[in-house]
């Protein structure tokens, strides 16, 4: 059998992906959360796990450094590549991509400034709304931007909305629903079709069982 390399990222996605892989007979031989290693052998001799930054998972899969990856839909939209397949919605790490602004402050009708990590997605969304915006790219602490008058709105991932409210902001419009997806390198799908199809089938069954529970 051919070796499969699966790219994952630490955090919530990893925590919710590992049980799905376990159901497919793939378990890391070491505790990923406690290790500083980035490459892990598994209980399946022909499968290894690669731990990356979330934004790098699609790149590794696109260029074939990993055969398979698990990535949030937000990252995939921003990556904007057609160089891999997206065969499976894992229905994990669910959240929403939303606009938000200072609570009680009405939305401005003219040109506005928007701070976000998701520049491509935000630009597309506001263009579809027919609104003129200046996009400011930030990498974190998004909630500070409106408070410090850096922008009028932010575009960010929202789970419960508690962080927004704690910083005097309120969610406004939902841009899209987000969940984690299984992605596959196109060449790997051809060269390792049997192994990857078996993985997809096993993980899909685990996803369906989880949803039904």
From Swiss-Prot:
Record GO terms (molecular function): ATP binding; ATP phosphoribosyltransferase activity
Catalytic activity: 1-(5-phospho-beta-D-ribosyl)-ATP + diphosphate = 5-phospho-alpha-D-ribose 1-diphosphate + ATP
Compartments in which it is found: Cytoplasm
Pathway recorded for this protein: Amino-acid biosynthesis; L-histidine biosynthesis; L-histidine from 5-phospho-alpha-D-ribose 1-diphosphate: step 1/9
Chief site of localization: cytoplasm
One Pfam family matching this protein: HisG
Disulfide bonds listed in the record: none
Keyword list, A-Z: Amino-acid biosynthesis, ATP-binding, Cytoplasm, Glycosyltransferase, Histidine biosynthesis, Nucleotide-binding, Transferase
Entry domain remark: Lacks the C-terminal regulatory region which is replaced by HisZ.
Subunit structure: Heteromultimer composed of HisG and HisZ subunits.
Name of the molecule in the record: ATP phosphoribosyltransferase
Name of the gene: hisG
